[in-house]
Amino acid sequence: MASAPTFDNNEFSTAPGDSIRNRVLTDPLETGSVVKLYTAAILIDQGIVTPNTMVDCENGYAVVNGRRLHDSPGHYLGMAPFREVLRWSSNIGIVKVAQELDNDKWYEYLQAFGLGRPTGVDLPGEGSGILYPVGRWTRLSRTSLPMGYELSLT
C-alpha cells in the first residue's frame, strides 16, 4: 500500500502531519471505470445482458438522459457485443445498458458489494467511501454511477 506525500520513518517526529496520513484508507476516491465491472456484474446477474448482447455505442458520442457522453478517442464503437463494451471501457455502452436497472435493486447490489462502508481491514482510520441512498440520486445519477462517478471508495 502506498501513499503520498511520504515521510522518513527515521525522522517521524519532524514529518508534517498531512504526510503521515494513509490516504489509501482515509481519502474517498471516485474510481471511475473500475465501477463498470460492478455495473456489468449486476446487469449480467439481473439477466439484462449477456456477454454477447449487442449494444449500440453510437460511434463514441451520445446523449443519454440529457447528458452528452463520449468514449475515449481511438475506442469508438458502433454496434458491439457487451464484452467489447467492457474491453474498451465504453462509457456510452455501459450507461445505455444500465438504464434498464431498477434504482432500488441497483443500490442493493452496490451495498452487497460493500460500497459505502468500511471493509473491516484491521488498519486504523479506514474511511467508508460514499454511496448515496437512492433518494439522493438525480436524473444524472443514472449516467454517472455506471461509469464510477457519484460514489467513492477508500
Residue ranges and their predicted role:
Residues 1-33, 38-154:
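Beta-lactam-recognizing serine transpeptidase/beta-lactamase-like catalytic domain environment
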